[in-house]
Amino acid sequence: MGELLDKLERASRGAATPLGFASAVKREKIAPMLLLGALAAGDAAGAKLAVDGALDGAIVVGTGGAKKADVDRSVAALDGVTFGVWLDEAQPKAPDGADFQVFSSEATPAGALSGDERTTVMQVVPELDDSLLRTIEALPVDAFLVSLADAGSLTVRQLMRLARVRGVTSRWILVHVASLPTKEELEQLRDAGAGAVVVDLAGATAASLKATRELLLELPHGPTKRKKGRGVVTLLAAAAPASGPSRREPEPDEDDDDDDEP
């Protein structure tokens, strides 16, 4: 399992039970969602924030024709940080040191998704046609990314767009937002089934990232209690099991099939 998936698993489980006498052992505080920072390829200041800030990982954004040299420069600056690279199309081979890759294009060659040695995240547009949206659970990827960064703040419409994707998959969902979310917005994202919040590092400061990290650590792992009402049915539970979203299973070896033959 890659580092990103391992951190998502830990966040979904919460604090582990300490060994020894519980009263004498301090439990490690674990936030219910990860905090990831997105930096443009070649952004030296963003890379420094990713290294020095209170982040669970970073994403180097190399979409839109970014130069490979800029991507490589940012990758080299992220030593010691769990990071991935976001490109238009998934690549057969990830940059050295990258734990995961994110891709946006549906035209990505299927062969680029082969192999179990790395974590693959696909960006899904919530406005995708219903017939296609319902098929994403069958794709050989580990998680999905939903970008809500087209709006300055989290709105009801944005939550509806997120719920549209959450309702058709049990995989992890990373949510890209335009600005550092407030405590109330973090609660809404957690309740909507987000496993990680992706924030742009451009314009952010170490202090603002630390403050957001503290807000995450203060969040309970359970959902916010809803106002009592009639005719309310919760659908998200079917897509997001209490034990945490599922992840794709590796393909069985061909040798295993031979063992079953008489």
Segments from the language model and where they lie:
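Conserved N-terminal beta1-alpha1 strand-loop-helix module at the mouth
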Residues: M1-V85, R247-P262
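Active-site-adjacent beta->alpha loops and helix N-cap segments on the catalytic face
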Residues: A15-G20, G62-D79, E89-P92, F100-R118, ...
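Catalytic cores of alpha/beta
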Residues: A45-A50, A90-G97, E127-A138, S179-V197
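Structural alpha-beta junctions
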Residues: A54-G57, V75-V85, D96-D99, D116-R118, ...
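C-terminal helical cap(s) of enzyme catalytic domains, especially alpha/beta-barrels
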Residues: D72-S74, G203-P262
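Short, basic, helix/turn surface patches
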Residues: V85-Q91, E127-T135, I173-H176, G222-L235
